[in-house]
């Protein structure tokens, strides 16, 4: 595989292992083959070790002395937990923004919202979503919260949301609610919008993993994002803002 310039080799290895996991090529309990990764990516064992340290910290793999690295539990509950954490953690920063919104930040968020509303293509919409989150988090999340948010997003693949055709219709109402809550200075409403968005994203991601047969839906579960909730995962929030 050719080297990706501008991307750290460690990050390239992390992305590769996560892709193997999300495509079903690595499953719970599987051993991570360092030699295979080194050969496939054309990297040394140093960035592979660095990647495994990060993935162990993030709960994706566990290392066993003299035995190697193994994939941790990866199931419906794992996906739900990652998204739940993402919603809660982003909700902290968003609630802080609502508690103390400055004219500068409100202006920046409104500009991103205009781009979100005008983005009809999934990739452009996803880029605007990340810009909105960056704007909030760079201003209101400290280094520790920033790092924890990044770790929670490992199993929320950007490539999927850049190609998912319904991302705008599904996700935009939550950003409308969050932005309005920040303007109204309502921290709990801003937090709830983040949590609701993450809940919907979790069900959408699970539906795709069920379709790929990477995961098996629990008996009696409806994998669709707008059907009955997956057992153990009740959607707590519905946006009221329509998609224009």
Curated annotation (Swiss-Prot):
Gene3D superfamilies: GntR ligand-binding domain-like, Winged helix-like DNA-binding domain superfamily/Winged helix DNA-binding domain. InterPro entries: TF_FadR/GntR_C, Tscrpt_reg_HTH_GntR, WH-like_DNA-bd_sf, WH_DNA-bd_sf. Signal peptide: none annotated. Residues 34-53 bind DNA. It comes from the Bacteria. PROSITE patterns: HTH_GNTR (PS50949). This is Uncharacterized HTH-type transcriptional regulator Mb0044c.
